[in-house]
Swiss-Prot record:
Signal peptide: none annotated. Keywords: ATP-binding, Ligase, Nucleotide-binding, Protein biosynthesis. It comes from Natranaerobius thermophilus (strain ATCC BAA-1301 / DSM 18059 / JW/NM-WN-LF). This is Glutamyl-tRNA(Gln) amidotransferase subunit A. Belongs to the amidase family. GatA subfamily. Disulfide bonds: none annotated. It is an enzyme of class 6 (ligase). Allows the formation of correctly charged Gln-tRNA(Gln) through the transamidation of misacylated Glu-tRNA(Gln) in organisms which lack glutaminyl-tRNA synthetase. The reaction takes place in the presence of glutamine and ATP through an activated gamma-phospho-Glu-tRNA(Gln). Its EC number is 6.3.5.7. The keyword ATP-binding applies.
Length: 491
């Protein structure tokens, strides 16, 4: 097996045992990126020179017997809306095309302390607004399983990079499903932690009450390790919760026979038959090891998407007001201040961003605040209450991650409602602030399908426990079809 094909834990063990050096590993990763990037287009920015220099330094420290962090010498990709000091953070937008942050996001500082090496910044939907990574201002990222299809979004670059074996670990952000949906589409594992578990400091905000940073990796074990690294209270983030963080890897390999697993019926009614069949088949496969299955109902789910697409754009319209050409980012050259504001935003923002900002501004306007935004907040409260009620009876919920398999590039570009429906199974979890992980559960016509395990607030451990057991029992990749990427020279 080539170095770039190894999982995060395999890489970690190999480095610690001296089977290969960090420089060899990082070189292998960049060779793989060079080999596949023309077909995938996962990266906006690569940091090869810095990464190789860092790998040599870590190899030197390891040779001297110095104490190193848990991710020392391991390459990681970062979604391009997470601030990286001295490395461009564009949010896949023209308005921030040349923006270089003067500081690191807290999660980047935590990765640095752990010894991780950043190999580049991944493509995304502009300002994380989208479900296909087609809204990037620069280029469209492709799905490694079929390069004519989308990888999902908005963290499509991160998911595609892990799926195509460019890196063992990537970070993304999840506002309404932006880690889990691309994880499902690309056949990788993606986790949205509880709101407040991972610091948002340094994440360029889309919707501040919904955004959460999380990992994407090749398996649940790797995700648990990554979550251990990036979790924890941060005084720089007022929404960060000061709770002790458990060792999430301790929950691996634990039995689930005493747990009650809820099956939310509404989620299964909202998805295509092939997706539904695969998730239900997975439930049957793990039944001998599982505890009790309980059919549960979350009736407000049918209104969740409407509430989400009022609350998120409303918050975005406020957050994106800071991009005005005055302090940072692109600026339209003119002597008139009003013209500068208007033209900077007109030329700097893409159509989807403008559309959502306008929708959010409308929802917050005096005549519609009560009828739209306030009502959406009430629906959000109902969704939270329903989850609380269900979790008084269940330990976790298992549901489909996405309603469909990956769709073709361009198929839904002119149909925003169909595009927005991709979030129907994921957005309610963000509205409730709960943890959820998407794991592969099979293939439909050669395309990956994911299921998600949803847990109680700050109970990521149980989510990982159940997801790992499912992963072990399904062994999805034992008889997996060949990636379309492999037929295009990306072997």
């Amino acid at each position: 097996m080539k170095l770039h094909e190894l999982t995060l834990m395999e890489v970690k063990r190999g480095l610690e045992q001296g089977d290969f050096s960090s420089e060899e590993l990082v070189t292998s990763v960049y060779d793989r990126i060079e080999e596949t990037e023309d077909h995938i287009k996962a990266y906006i920015t690569l940091t090869k020179e810095q990464a190789l220099a860092q790998s040599k330094e870590i190899d030197s420290q390891r040779a001297k017997g110095e104490e190193l962090g848990p991710l020392a010498g391991i390459p990681v990709a970062i979604k391009d809306n997470i601030c990286t000091k001295d490395v461009t953070t564009s949010c896949a937008s023209k308005i921030l095309e040349d923006f270089v942050p003067p500081y690191n996001a807290t999660v980047i500082s935590k990765l640095a302390e752990a010894g991780a090496i950043i190999v580049g910044k991944t493509n995304m939907d502009e300002f994380a607004m989208g479900s296909s990574t087609e809204n990037s201002a620069f280029f469209v990222t492709s799905n490694p399983w079929d390069t004519e299809r989308v990888p999902g979004g908005s963290s499509g670059g991160s998911a595609a990079s892990v799926a195509s074996a460019q890196v063992p670990l990537a970070l993304g952000s999840d506002t309404g499903g932006s880690i889990r949906q691309p994880a499902s589409f690309c056949g990788v594992v993606g986790m949205k932690p509880t709101y407040g578990r991972v610091s948002r400091y340094g994440l360029v905000a889309f919707a501040s009450s919904l955004d959460q940073i999380g990992p994407l990796s090749k398996n649940v074990e790797d995700t648990a390790l990554a979550l251990d690294i990036i979790s924890g209270h941060d005084h720089m983030d007022s929404t960060s919760v000061d709770l002790e963080v458990p060792n999430h890897t301790d929950f691996l390999n634990q039995d689930i026979d005493e747990l009650t697993i809820g099956i939310p019926k509404e989620y299964y009614e909202l998805v295509d038959n092939d997706v539904k069949s695969l998730v239900e088949s997975s439930l049957q496969s793990i039944e001998p090891e599982a505890g009790n299955y309980r059919q549960v109902s979350l009736p407000t789910t049918e209104h969740a998407l409407s509430a989400y697409y009022l609350i998120a754009p409303a918050e975005a319209s406020s957050n994106l007001a800071r991009f005005d050409g005055v302090r940072y980012g692109q600026r339209f050259a003119t002597d008139d201040l009003k013209t500068m504001y208007n033209q900077t935003r007109k030329e700097g923002f893409g159509n989807e961003v403008k559309q959502r900002v306008m929708l959010g501004t409308y929802a917050l306007s005096a005549g519609y605040y009560d009828a739209l935004y306030l009502k959406a907040l009430k629906v959000r409260s109902l969704i939270k209450q329903e989850f609380e009620q269900v979790f008084s009876e269940c330990d976790v919920l298992i549901a489909p991650t996405t309603p469909t398999v990956p769709f073709r590039e361009g198929e839904n570009v002119d149909d925003p409602l169909t595009m927005y429906k991709n979030d129907i199974c994921t957005a309610p979890v963000n509205l409730a602030g709960l943890p959820s992980i998407s794991i592969p559960c099979g293939f439909s016509n050669g395309l990956p399908v994911g299921l998600q395990v949803i847990g109680k607030a700050f109970d990521e451990g149980k989510v990982i426990q159940v997801a790992h057991k499912i992963e072990q029992m399904l062994q999805v990749f034992k008889n997996a079809p060949q990636q379309g990427l492999d037929n295009q020279g990306g072997k």
